[in-house]
Structures are given as structure tokens and as C-alpha cells.
Regions:
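Cytosolic regulatory regions of ion transport systems
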Residues: 1-452
Length: 452
């Protein structure tokens, strides 16, 4: 497809890299020549220097023949206006990044009235992901499918866990409840496991299971868990505001430390149930005074990756807390594997996942096997996709054991009218099902792509 991206920032560049990898024709628009030069040195794209809200600039970028226009500049207003002009100029699909909390309340009205195909709020989406991690403190990552009926949860197998040295095939019979191990990361290697694979101490495993069974499973297999009652957040930006709102509704005690006095005053008015502390979150004495040692969860959400890493390492040292760190520039896998700071979230990757899901659904619009959900796991080396199943000869009605599936691919879960099935070889896919596929084959666009 022909895709135009307005904005060469972190999100735009990350998205452009993936779209080019999936063989789309990408053109960038930005007013900053140095950013355009940088992106041209990284990926094979066309670039236009100019204002994306000006019709002549859009025309030069090829808007009349574009399939999709994505606006991810730093300005919500520019994103919305450029999408409106792009829609009028070519009737293409339009995607806008909209971050202002004032717009967030009316986003469905804005989307409908402006004819937007999709809106994405990275700060809100990241706050929701962090809230999931706080809900399941034993997890390193939580992704949801089937309208939140099914979850893929990543755990670290600790020393002393009964899972260590157990075959994957034996796990289901050894413990009560329903869960399936679908991905293993071991010493930088990704394994889509067969039943013969033996689990090891230190493995990162991604497990499909219902949320209600997580605590019971963790206790049975020796993974430490706890009930989080209070949360300390470093940084008082928009993401912290969204997160505090979510946590307040869940009756968590929240404390935000913010350096800017005016921002503190604003947050105090917006978040009456949250304690707002004016001060420098990198000041260890202040953290001690605010009793960081007693906090159940510490979330580093300042605007600087380096500060967030420092804060998380300090929290790990002085508090027995669930540790969550926001990273946007530094390579995520280096942080999570080398520094072991806890759970790492990246707004640019969350945004990219969301938009890629829409792009692949567009490509597959002529087929009914559409992508409902897409997550990229393990430093983007694994994809977990949820497909809606339509009647497909050679695929539907055939026992799974008789399908010629690609290697390094696993059908993890079937949702049949709200009934969640952990599939065996004797199960079949039926029209109307949704199915979760986990694979190292990146870029699947339709369900039939799972076949050799």
C-alpha cells in the first residue's frame, strides 16, 4: 500500500521501519530537514519537507494515490487537521495520534465527525498496560485477547520453581486450572515449544490463561505474587495522570512526585484522590522521606529514559516493590535483560502495534479472516495475533493435527461464542471462531498464512 506518515519523531520512525519491512511504499512529511535526513539514512522511504496541513505539500507527497495517511506529529491539532485535509483530498483511510486529555473525553465524537479511521492515544494506551501489570504484579508483561476473556502473561521462572526441569507436555497435567505455555525466551533464543521442550530456571515464558487463575497458578508453581495497595509514580506528565485515574478507580493509593510546581497544582485539582508531591524524584532523600521502602509498586514515568532507569534501579535496591519503567529511546531488550529493572513499557511500540493491526486489517479487507488483535513480543521477534475465522477450504473443519502448519507457529486458543478452548490435535477451526496464533513468522496478514 501507499502510506504517508506526517511526523518523523520516535513513533513515526518506528512505524515507518516496520511498514517498509512489510513492503509498503512509505513517504514521510516533516518540517525538520535534519529529521528527514536521519530517517532517509535509516530506511528506504521518500521524504517531503513541508507543512502536512497544507494541501500542496500533501499533493507533493502523493496524497491523491495514498491508501493510508498517518499523522503522528507532536501537535494533536495538526494531526487532526492534516487528517481532515487528507480525507477530503483522496478519501484515503486516516489515523491520528491524539494525546490531550481534554480531547480524550470526546474522542469518539471527534473520530466520527472528522471521518477518522482510527485514533491512538499512546499515553492512555501505555497507562492501561501499566495498570494491567499492577493488577498482576508477578507478570512481566500482560496482553489481552477476545475482549479481555483471554490473556497472555509473561513470567520469569525463578529459582526453586517446580516448573524448572519440567517438560512442557507435563505442565498441564501437573497443575489445576487452564494454561498453555506458548513462547519461551532462553539466553536470547526464542522457542515456540513442543511438548518435549524442558523448562529451565531463568526462562521467560509467555502463558495463555484466564486472569482469575493467575494467583492460584503462581502459588502452585512457586512464582512470588502480592496484592498491590499503594503505588508511587515518578513524574507528573499526561501518562501519570491517566494511570492515577485508572488506579484511583481500582481503590489504589497513589502518590505522584513532580518537579514542576504549576504542574503539581494542576494535578492536585484533577486528581483529588491522589497525593501530589512537589519535588525531584531523583533525590534519594526525598524518596526516603516519602517512604519508598514501603511502596508496593514503583513506576518511573519521567520524560528521560536515563532518569527512569536510575530511579528503577534505586527502587529495586531500597524497596521490595513491583518495578515498572517507561523507555522510549534506549533498546528495550538491553534494559530488560541486562539491567533486570522489572517490567519495561514503551509507548512507541504500543502505538506501532495498534496501527500495524489496522494496516494489516486494511490489507485483508477483501477476506473475512481479519486480524482482531496484534501484539509484538520478545523485542519484536514474536507476534501474537487474533484472527476471526471464515469458511476456508483446507483450513476450517480440519482437525488441527492434520493441518500442515509452518514451523515455529502455535495455535494457542480458540474462542467459540465466548467459550474459551485450549486446542488439542482433535479440535477444528469453525466459521465464526476467533483463534490466537503465536509465531516467529512476522507479518502474517491472513489466517491462511499459517499453512506451509
Amino acid at each position: 500500500m501507499n502510506i504517508i506518515i506526517a511526523g518523523c519523531g520516535k513513533v513515526g520512525t518506528t512505524l515507518g521501519e516496520q511498514l517498509v519491512r512489510e513492503r509498503h511504499e512509505v513517504t514521510f512529511i516533516d518540517t525538520a530537514p535534519e529529521l528527514l535526513k536521519k530517517v532517509m539514512g535509516m530506511i528506504d522511504v521518500q521524504v517531503i519537507e513541508g507543512n502536512c496541513t497544507v494541501y500542496s505539500t500533501l499533493k507533493e507527497a502523493g496524497i491523491e494515490h495514498a491508501d493510508l495517511f498517518i499523522a503522528v506529529t507532536d501537535s494533536d491539532e495538526i494531526n487532526l487537521l492534516s487528517c481532515l485535509i487528507a480525507k477530503k483530498a483522496s478519501n484515503c483511510h486516516t489515523v491520528a495520534r491524539v494525546r490531550n486529555p481534554e480531547y480524550n473525553e470526546d474522542i469518539q465524537f471527534i473520530k466520527q465527525e472528522m471521518g477518522l479511521s482510527l485514533t491512538i492515544n499512546p499515553e492512555w494506551a501505555t497507562a492501561v498496560e501499566i495498570a494491567r501489570l499492577i493488577q498482576i504484579p508477578s507478570a512481566m508483561e500482560v496482553d489481552s485477547f477476545a475482549n479481555n476473556r483471554v490473556n497472555m502473561i509473561r513470567f520469569l521462572i525463578p529459582e526453586g520453581s517446580v516448573l524448572a526441569d519440567m517438560k512442557v507436555a507435563d505442565v498441564g497435567g501437573a497443575f489445576k486450572g487452564s494454561f498453555l505455555i506458548c513462547v519461551i525466551e532462553r539466553n536470547h533464543e526464542i522457542i515456540i515449544p513442543s511438548g518435549d521442550v524442558v523448562l529451565k530456571k531463568g526462562d521467560n515464558i509467555s502463558v495463555i490463561m484466564p486472569l482469575a487463575e493467575v494467583d492460584k497458578m503462581c502459588k502452585e508453581v512457586g512464582i512470588h505474587t502480592r496484592n498491590i495497595k499503594n503505588v508511587m509514580i515518578a513524574g507528573g506528565g499526561t501518562m501519570s495522570y491517566y494511570l492515577a485515574k485508572i488506579l484511583n478507580k481500582a481503590n489504589k493509593k497513589v502518590k505522584i512526585i513532580e518537579m514542576n510546581r504549576k504542574r503539581c497544582e494542576l494535578l492536585s485539582g484533577l486528581l483529588p484522590k491522589t497525593m501530589i508531591i512537589h519535588g525531584d524524584a531523583t533525590d534519594s532523600k526525598l524518596l526516603e522521606e516519602e517512604d519508598i521502602a514501603a511502596t508496593d509498586a514503583f513506576v518511573a514515568l519521567t520524560g528521560f529514559d536515563e532518569e527512569n532507569l536510575f530511579l528503577s534501579l534505586h527502587a529495586k535496591k531500597v524497596a521490595n516493590a513491583k518495578n515498572i519503567v517507561k523507555i522510549n529511546r534506549i533498546r528495550v531488550e538491553e534494559v530488560s535483560e541486562e539491567l533486570n529493572v522489572g517490567s519495561v513499557v514503551s509507548p512507541k511500540f504500543i502505538t506501532t502495534e495498534f496501527i500495524l493491526q489496522y494496516v494489516r486489517a486494511m490489507e485483508n479487507s477483501k477476506s473475512n479472516n481479519s486480524i482482531e488483535t496484534l501484539y509484538r513480543l520478545m523485542d519484536n521477534r514474536v507476534e501474537a495475533l487474533e484472527f476471526v475465522v471464515c469458511d476456508t477450504p483446507g483450513l476450517t473443519g480440519v482437525q488441527l493435527q492434520d493441518l500442515k502448519l509452518k514451523k515455529n507457529l502455535l495455535l494457542c486458543c480458540i474462542n467459540r461464542g465466548g467459550n474459551i478452548i485450549t486446542p488439542s490435535g482433535q479440535d477444528c477451526l469453525l466459521e465464526g471462531d476467533s483463534v490466537i496464533v503465536v509465531t516467529t513468522h512476522l507479518g502474517l496478514k491472513r489466517l491462511s498464512d499459517i499453512l506451509k
